[in-house]
Amino acid sequence: ATGKLYQTFWYNNGVKEDTAVMYYEDGMRVFRKTPFRRDTMHGVQIQYYKSGRIRAKLEFVDGLRKPYLEEFKSDGTPITDYASLVVETSDNYKQNGTYTIKLSLNKKDVKANFYRGGYQNGLFNPKAVAKINDSDYSGVILLRKTADPAQNYVEVIAEILTPLGNRLLEYRKIDLPYNDLK
């Protein structure tokens, strides 16, 4: 331990309330401010460069992420050149009753988590979706023909690692050519 201030929390009746502040290693400059309500992240988290300029903004509601993310270069310019989701499908329905969805990114060296499922009330809930990664860079959904009717679409979310270490969320609804796949 260096003896320098690292993080501050405000507590009310034993639970985190208000804004938690994390500092750079010098103990003076603010790295991140995270709002809390009843011990849970709630509101816009703001990250800062050592210069004091805003580095990133992410929003939470009751501990869950909203898709909102803004990141900025050290000169204040918005970052916009993120990797994005690429969807490839393979239709073998007539041959063996399968339909495969492969997820990857347009930038092959960027890591991501891929999930089957969508947002709940506009929020990303990792417990309500199924991780489908087959590597750090791709995910696969193998659907099979069933005797029962099923949804004619699949929802997916890519949780993309940004150059600043945050997670960009990208949602996609993929229409299926058949309504009996599970």
Annotate each predicted stretch with a short phrase.
Residues 1-182:
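Glycine/tyrosine- and acidic-biased, solvent-exposed loop/turn segments at the edges of beta-strands
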